[in-house]
């Protein structure tokens, strides 16, 4: 090869290498240092930036130490197990505490009024952080979209979660709960009592519910998707415990290969279900499950604007279905599990809830009107959501300079809204903030704390969780039917060890002793 060509190639490679090095230096050093100086100059104190890792290594170390031992005797003072680094940062640096997610600064916002300002997002200055490609393999959909795409998808999906539509899902809720009750009655048998780890049982229950309510007659395929998505979630948890390196997902490691294989299978299953449903709709066969409603309203949206480009594509529908699975299954299963655990810890409240269920339903099938009248059960569920919210924090990012609480946040700063820390804060909940006291919700959510924004387990504002009504209705149905058939207490084998694996879960299971009534 001509020496001039070789020289030109060498110069080109050198220029490319120099550009990569400059970009890496900017991303990993100069930008974090600029952002840190800007924040500290305005009084935001916190952890110093550590090259590349930020607080990751310290987070892993502290969390490993905190989770080594369960909480004995069981109590609701457990924030040190959930996020020991943030707890220490807030204790040392105040409620505007700076921590680091790799080279990205994260400032925690503990003031409910500032949380309200961020979540209301009136001027569009706060966006959701961009999801890493590896996260998108699990789910994107409505929860991750911004701007016009979010508006369009929310408008299409919203009618599927209206009250009248939720009422039609009660038979599916009842069928799944009946199967669970029947299985537990078989386990207890003639012994009258039996130890059961209710955590995997309730995961299966809510997985079955979302399979039936999302896909109806395609239930078997739906359950396979649930199993695959659960495995994808486990792989994601392992991945987020390491520093994110752009392009790493393309390396043919066993886990990367498995992630890609799961994603392809899930997409193929969903595409097959959607195509069958499209063909059925053309024949006039309409379904009332979530997929059917989603496709019906998507078609209406396209017809209203007289353009196929206005509605969702098949890929969009696939992403929304994946999100149904993650959000619909995870959040309700952990809510029901922690509710059983806390009612096992506090039997007087279990008795009060059972008495109310008995007064409203007797031994009859729970119906919508009766579920709506369950005041004590609702108070209990709210208090469980306060102490053990399924999602422990929300995040937003600035994409241009934004004033908040007297501080001008530069672009590309993450704002953490630590739901669980605010839910446990005595400043808003009183000295009994870390005690189980459903009576605080006796007069409703608005009067439960010193600031109404101190309780936001489903988020708040225009992006409040679209499925909160679905989750609460399912939880009321499940809990009511369990209380009708069983009393329960914590097993001696139960270890109280809340920890986070995307959602707040019992680390060692939820072993309960069930007594048939």
From Swiss-Prot:
Q: Where are the transmembrane segments?
A: 5-25
Subcellular localization is given as:
Membrane
- Mind telling me which InterPro entries this protein's record contains? Cyt_P450 (IPR001128), Cyt_P450_CS (IPR017972), Cyt_P450_E_grp-I (IPR002401), Cyt_P450_sf (IPR036396), Cytochrome_P450_Monooxygen (IPR050665)
Alphabetized, the UniProt keywords read: Cholesterol metabolism, Heme, Iron, Lipid biosynthesis, Lipid metabolism, Membrane, Metal-binding, Monooxygenase, Oxidoreductase, Steroid biosynthesis, Steroid metabolism, Sterol metabolism, Transmembrane, Transmembrane helix
Q: What is its main location?
A: membrane
Entry membrane topology: Single-pass membrane protein
- Which BP terms in the Gene Ontology apply to this protein? cholesterol metabolic process; saponin biosynthetic process; steroid biosynthetic process
UniProt-listed Pfam families:
p450 (PF00067)
Entry EC number(s): 1.14.14.-
Q: In which pathway does it act?
A: Steroid metabolism; cholesterol metabolism
Residues given in the record as heme binding sites: 465
Q: Which GO terms describe its molecular function?
A: heme binding; iron ion binding; monooxygenase activity; oxidoreductase activity, acting on paired donors, with incorporation or reduction of molecular oxygen
**Similarity field:** Belongs to the cytochrome P450 family.
The record's PANTHER family line, in alphabetical order, gives: CYTOCHROME P450 72A11-RELATED (PTHR24282:SF255), CYTOCHROME P450 FAMILY MEMBER (PTHR24282)
* Record's protein name: Cytochrome P450 CYP72A616
Gene name, Swiss-Prot/TrEMBL: CYP72A616
């Amino acid at each position: 090869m001509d020496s001039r060509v070789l020289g030109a190639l060498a110069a080109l490679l050198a220029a490319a290498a120099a550009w990569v090095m400059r970009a890496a230096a900017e991303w990993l050093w100069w930008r974090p240092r600029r952002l840190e100086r800007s924040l500290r100059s305005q009084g935001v104190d916190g952890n110093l930036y550590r090259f590349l890792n930020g607080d990751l290594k310290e987070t892993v170390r502290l969390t490993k130490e905190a989770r080594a031992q369960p909480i004995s005797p069981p109590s609701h003072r457990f924030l040190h197990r959930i996020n020991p680094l943030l707890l220490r940062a807030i204790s040392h640096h105040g409620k505007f505490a700076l921590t680091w997610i790799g080279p990205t600064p994260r400032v925690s916002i503990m003031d409910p009024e500032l949380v309200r300002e961020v979540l209301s997002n009136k001027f569009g200055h706060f966006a959701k952080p961009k999801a890493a490609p590896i996260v998108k393999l699990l789910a994107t959909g409505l929860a991750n979209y911004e701007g016009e795409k979010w508006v369009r998808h929310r408008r299409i999906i919203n009618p599927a979660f209206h009250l009248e539509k939720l009422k039609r899902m009660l038979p599916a809720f009842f069928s799944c709960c009946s199967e669970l009750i029947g299985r537990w009655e078989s386990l207890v048998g003639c012994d009258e009592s039996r130890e059961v780890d209710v955590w995997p049982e309730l995961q299966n229950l809510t997985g079955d519910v979302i399979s039936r309510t999302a896909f109806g007659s395609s239930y078997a395929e739906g359950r396979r998707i649930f199993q695959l998505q659960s495995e994808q979630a486990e792989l994601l948890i392992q991945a987020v415990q390491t520093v994110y390196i752009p392009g790493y997902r393309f390396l043919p490691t066993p886990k990367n290969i498995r992630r890609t294989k799961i994603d392809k299978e899930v997409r193929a299953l969903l595409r097959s279900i959607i195509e069958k449903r499209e063909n059925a709709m053309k024949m006039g066969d309409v379904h009332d499950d979530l997929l059917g409603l989603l496709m019906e309203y998507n078609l209406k949206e396209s017809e209203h604007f007289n353009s196929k480009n206005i509605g969702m594509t098949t890929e969009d529908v696939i992403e929304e279905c994946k999100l149904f699975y993650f959000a619909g299954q995870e959040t309700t299963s952990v809510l029901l599990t922690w509710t059983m655990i806390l009612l096992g810890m506090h039997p007087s409240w279990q008795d009060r809830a059972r008495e109310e269920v008995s007064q409203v339903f007797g031994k009859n099938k729970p119906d919508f009107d009766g579920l709506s009248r369950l005041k004590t059960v609702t108070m209990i569920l709210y208090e469980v959501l306060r102490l053990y919210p399924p999602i422990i924090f929300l995040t937003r990012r600035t994409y241009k300079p934004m004033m908040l609480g007297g501080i001008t946040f530069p672009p590309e700063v993450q704002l953490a809204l630590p739901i669980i820390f605010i839910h446990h804060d005595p400043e808003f909940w009183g000295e009994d903030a870390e005690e189980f006291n459903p009576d605080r919700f006796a007069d409703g959510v608005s009067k439960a704390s010193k600031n109404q924004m101190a309780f936001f387990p489903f988020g708040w504002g225009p992006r409040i969780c679209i499925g909160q009504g679905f989750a609460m209705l399912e939880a009321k149905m499940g809990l009511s039917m369990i209380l009708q058939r069983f009393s329960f207490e914590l097993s001696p084998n139960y270890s109280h060890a809340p920890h986070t694996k995307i959602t707040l879960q019992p680390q060692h299971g939820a072993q309960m002793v069930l007594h048939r009534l």
